[in-house]
């Protein structure tokens, strides 16, 4: 279903997940769409790990996304939802946009379809879900935006389309993931078993020894 949503996009792809890991066929599809259908806008919203955003979206994957032709990337600290849609279908699911989850985990979700044909009914779950996540996206921290501004019709094709880039990576993403910040947040591994004497247990949250 996620595959169908990405492949079937004609105007927009909206990807919401706390964690992104770009590998495999889904990344290839997005690369292909960016090249073959550059007018399709791609919105990406990720979250969690404010002190170290690279745990949610690596720098390599961020750079891959930045290479796409029509892309808007934003960050919401408290994001935990997973939502994927194009202009006519949406998937609310437990699935992170992560290579391991996509290929190994047992996941579930609900598919919603646009009810544009039924303009009378008050029960329009696709539109309500889309509006909610769009509002969440617009309120989120901008990381990177690249869009294309069409040349004026009065230039008679003599002026190329203008690519507009708004890059906040260095002030937002980099600031949160610099070496000093990583050093502050680095924790020593917690031992759950020792080789000498009696075995000891430790709390996985605090690392305190459990008698």
Regions found by a protein language model. Give the residues of each.
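HKD-type phospholipase D/PLD-like phosphodiesterase module
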Residues: 1, 24, 36, 40-129
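Primarily the HKD phosphodiesterase
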Residues: 2-68, 183-189, 195-199, 209-211
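Signature of lipid phosphatidyltransferase scaffolds
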Residues: 92-196
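Cys/His/Pro-rich metal-binding microdomains
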Residues: 204
């Amino acid at each position: 279903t996620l595959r169908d949503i990405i492949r079937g996009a004609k105007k927009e792809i909206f990807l919401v997940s706390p964690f992104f890991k770009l590998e495999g066929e889904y990344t290839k599809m997005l690369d292909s769409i960016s090249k073959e259908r550059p007018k399709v806008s791609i919105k990406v919203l990720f979250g969690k790990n404010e002190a170290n955003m690279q745990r949610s979206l690596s720098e390599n994957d961020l750079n891959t996304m930045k290479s796409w032709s029509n892309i808007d990337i934003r960050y919401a600290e408290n994001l935990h939802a997973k939502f994927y849609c194009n202009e006519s279908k949406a998937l609310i699911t437990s699935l992170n946009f992560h290579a391991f989850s996509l290929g190994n985990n047992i996941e579930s979700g609900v598919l919603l379809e646009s009810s544009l044909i039924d303009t009378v009914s008050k029960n329009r779950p696709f539109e309500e879900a889309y509006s909610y996540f769009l509002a969440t996206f617009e309120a989120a921290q901008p990381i990177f935006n690249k869009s294309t501004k069409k040349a004026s019709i009065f230039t008679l094709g003599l002026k190329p389309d203008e690519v507009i880039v708004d890059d906040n990576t260095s002030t937002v993403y980099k600031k949160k993931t610099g070496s000093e910040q990583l050093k502050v947040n680095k924790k020593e591994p917690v031992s759950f078993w020792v080789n000498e004497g009696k075995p000891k247990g430790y709390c996985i949250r605090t690392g305190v020894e459990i008698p």
